[in-house]
Amino acid sequence: MARAGGNCGVWRSLVLLGLYGCSVVRAAGTSVTVDRHAPASSYEFSMWVEKDGVSSSPQIPVTTAAPNPVRNLRVEGQNNISISLSWEPPDQSSLQGLTYWTQCSRHGGQTETRNTTDTSVTVDGLDPGSSYECSVWVEKDGLYSKNETLNTSTAPNPVRNLRVEGQNNISISLSWEPPDQPSLQGLTYWAQCSRHGGQTETRNTADTSVTVDGLDPGSSYECSVWVEKDGVYSTNETLNTSTAPNPVRNLRVEGQNNISISLSWEPPDQPSLQGLTYWAQCSRHGGQTETRNTTDTSITVDGLDPGSSYECSVWVEKDGVYSTNETLSNTTAPNPVRNLRVKSQNNFSISLSWEPPDQPSLQGLIYWAQCSRHGGQTETRNTTDTSVTVDGLDPGFLYKCSVWVEKDGVYSTNETLNTSTVPISASNPVRNLRVEGQNNFSISLSWEPPDQSSLQGLTYWAQCSRHGGQTETRNTADTSVTVDGLDPGSSYECSVWVEKDGVYSTNETLNTSTVPAAVNITSCISTSGGYGVLLTWSCPSGGYESFEVKVGRKWRSENGSLCGKGVTVSDLEPAQSYTATVTTVFKDLKAQSLSTTCHTESAAIIAGAIVGILLLFILVGLLIVFLKRRRKKRQPKEVPKDLVCSCPGDILAKDFADHVRENEKDSNCGFAEEYQQLALEGQGQSQITASALENRSKNRYRNVLPYDWSRVPLQPLQEEPGSDYINASFMPGLWSPKEFIATQGPLPNTVGDFWRMVWEQQSHTLVMLTNCMESGRVKCEHYWPLDAQPCIHGQLQVMLISEEASENWTVRHLQLFHMKEQQTLSLRQFHYLAWPDHGVPYSPDPLLAFRKMLRQWMDQTTDGGPPIVHCSAGVGRTGTLIALDVLLRQLECEGLVGPFSFVKKMRESRPLMVQTEAQYVFLHQCILKSLQKPAPALVPEEAMYENVASLVYENASAIMAHESEFSASGC
């Protein structure tokens, strides 16, 4: 029978297997195992049945043998989400058509399967830090080899939030949060700190913190932490930090005085001293702490309290890491005693007393007193009292006695005086001690010799001492001596005693003074149109009490505060030359300056003014005649004489309307008469400070100067002549002579002075009655902030808090902060906008409403200083508003009102208050309106000199009324 795969020449009832040849296997059952075949090879099987030598037809299935498994399966690497495997191919004849399958399974969890035709694969998508069983098998033609299996793990995730918990000089403590992964079992954390080019220290732990010790002090380290699980490591988390430096060595006090302690030390014992900063801190228990730093190994901590105990610490910083402190206790030196003096002395002792030092604490003080004789004996005593007797001294000797203070072994500086014990057998004292003469720098003394039998071998000692200051001592064998080297204008106590054979008599003493120094006249300027001069001189060295000023035959005495400020001498003749001297006076001793020649101005200006005044007289006379004729035509009856040019006093409220109507007749003739009577009020008062050379630039208008007696003084600034001056005056009110302050609108150079005045007076209220610019001319500097950005003026900071604007006024809430005193002052500025330049408001109503609002605010803020009111010059609009407020309150309180009397009173405190007749009339109209009576329209006018090189008349009649003695009689 023919058989597939060739003729094998064998015919039996059996199963035939063909493999490039033939193999025959007999089987009596229904299955058979064929071995010794090649793996992963294709075979053709023929199967038939034989019985009794007869065979069935063959059945021919085709099949393949399974491949062999892979060899040498191994892990090539892993990270936190994958495992990389590799292997060698199976040991078989053919490797064609092989597919490798890889599967990694986590117990009870995730399984990931991959296949490849290579001999390596990466299984990803795994969980970090997890154990996996990984298997690899081979597939060919749908048949699979056996599995090769190994166990491995993914790398853990890195730690989170690695940080330094602390460090000292040999260790760094690290902490972290565990990795973010499903399982934290079986984790080991490794920490390693490495110094560049040097030491490395490694530690491991199962906790989330570790201390790496054995490090070098004051060194920079890179510290890394990683996680291990099953021998697999995470990536590193790394930070840079440093160990603390070692502490300083041998900390010691090098010295101290009453306000500081000087410390020194040796640098720390460590490999590197680069980049070290040393910090020193001295703390007083329950009180002050002062801290300083340096890169040196010594420092002085100052700003301490005298005679106080401090704990002083020094530590080292490097890269923001600090060593431990080295600490010692020490005390600042006490302040010296005050007012050391001799209470008494006898032959063998000197009793001293003093006042305790000026310092916070007087506890634990010991006072030491020592009296020493030159080249000889020294005696020292101590006490806790403020007086002591130093005994055991030799009689009749001069001693230098010193007293100092000790606290905690630290000593103050010495206070010293010279005195002597009483001699046992010495010369009698000198007689008739007297001053023979003195000059700026010396005092000449003379005396009669002592009353005794022998005058041989006598030495006279003279000593002049200034209280709390200089002492000069001289000796001579004569009965006179000049003690020089003294200060001019100073009081001295001068003593003379006798020495014989080293033994001293008692002292004879007198009080005298040196002559003051003469001044140097710096300028003499003509003023008042040639009728006066302004004389200025420099302050002399030394002391002085007053100055005698002489210009020609004019003589006056001025107090000592006027040096450097200038004095005006009046009643001189124009176009003349005068000899001027200034004599310094101290204790009835005088020193006259070198004379200078002063020249008054030419009288040409005055002559022109006189001609102008005469012409004005003529014009006014013609005007008076015209008005009188007009009045006679309009009013047949003659006006009673007691109504012409009368000076009205207080007027009853019910009569005020009649008073106004009467004055309004004949074009306000009555008001004109009243106002003329006010023209010269207040003139002739002293304005020396305002006229001083250094203050001239601070005045906006030359003819509006505050009187000396009523001006608002500022606290003077050190070494700034004229810094106490501002053009401002205290003004009377209803209840007080200083109820208001009237001032000019600030100039650019006086804004700081203006805010100083507000602060010093503690005023809560500013009233501004002008606009900064009017009719194209600057009337006031813009002295408050424009917005939220504060303005700085010296020590004062001005802030705008809020602003409320209405049709006729604006109210600003301001805050003043004193940067040195750290104090705040709140205030409001009431800015009236509707007062026209060179005029008066069109109606009383807005001003009355403004005044009512202002008065309500002032009644609420009674704890501060006086309200400060200004316009441009601080006289016209300012005077009108002050008068209106006071007179309306007078009406409310008394039922009376006296405009004339109050304006007169204001002009006694500041010139030109209620500056124009129109303002005077408007004042009456406002009062009348407040009594519910109508007010007529007003004619505007305003006047003053501008502070410019050429004087400009803004209102000739008002200025003439103020500066001349002209007074019109009648209308």
Swiss-Prot record:
Extracellular side: 28-604
Membrane topology of the entry: Single-pass type I membrane protein
Disruption phenotype: Viable and fertile. No significant effect on body weight or nutrient absorption. Morphology of intestinal epithelium cells appears to be normal. Double knockouts with APC heterozygotes, a model for intestinal tumorigenesis, show reduced adenoma growth. Double knockouts with IL10, a model of inflammatory bowel disease, show significantly increased colonic inflammation in the presence of commensal bacteria and reduced survival rates.
GO molecular function, one term: protein tyrosine phosphatase activity
Residue ranges crossing the lipid bilayer per the database entry: 605-625
Annotated keywords: Cell membrane, Cell projection, Cytoplasm, Disulfide bond, Glycoprotein, Hydrolase, Membrane, Phosphoprotein, Protein phosphatase, Signal, Transmembrane, Transmembrane helix
Gene3D superfamilies: Cytochrome c1, transmembrane anchor, C-terminal, Immunoglobulins, Protein tyrosine phosphatase superfamily
Tissues/organs with expression: Expressed strongly in the intestinal tract, with particularly high levels in the duodenum and jejunum (at protein level). Also expressed at low level in the testis (at protein level). Not detected in other tissues tested (at protein level).
The protein's Enzyme Commission number: 3.1.3.48
Signal peptide: 1-27
InterPro entries (alphabetical): FN3_dom, FN3_sf, Ig-like_fold, Prot-tyrosine_phosphatase-like, PTP_cat, RTP_Phos/Ushers, Tyr_Pase_AS, Tyr_Pase_cat
Residues at the catalytic site: 871
Glycan-modified residues: 80, 115, 169, 293, 382, 440, 520
Entry's Gene Ontology BP terms: peptidyl-tyrosine dephosphorylation involved in inactivation of protein kinase activity
SMART domains: FN3, PTPc, PTPc_motif
Effect of substituting residue 953 to A: Reduces tyrosine phosphorylation. Abolishes tyrosine phosphorylation and interaction with GRB2 and FYN
Catalytic activity: O-phospho-L-tyrosyl-[protein] + H2O = L-tyrosyl-[protein] + phosphate
Subcellular location: Cell projection, Microvillus membrane; Cytoplasm; Apical cell membrane
PROSITE patterns reported in the protein's UniProt record: FN3, TYR_PHOSPHATASE_1, TYR_PHOSPHATASE_2, TYR_PHOSPHATASE_PTP
Keyword Metal-binding part of the UniProt annotation: no
Main location: membrane
GO cellular component term of the entry, any: microvillus membrane
Disulfide bonds: none
Record-annotated Fibronectin type-III domain positions: 69-158, 159-246, 247-336, 337-425, 429-518, 519-603
Stated role: Protein phosphatase that may contribute to contact inhibition of cell growth and motility by mediating the dephosphorylation of focal adhesion-associated substrates and thus negatively regulating integrin-promoted signaling processes. Induces apoptotic cell death by at least two distinct mechanisms: inhibition of cell survival signaling mediated by PI 3-kinase, Akt, and ILK and activation of a caspase-dependent proapoptotic pathway. Inhibits the basal activity of LCK and its activation in response to TCR stimulation and TCR-induced activation of MAP kinase and surface expression of CD69.
Name under which the protein is recorded: Receptor-type tyrosine-protein phosphatase H
Organism name: Mus musculus
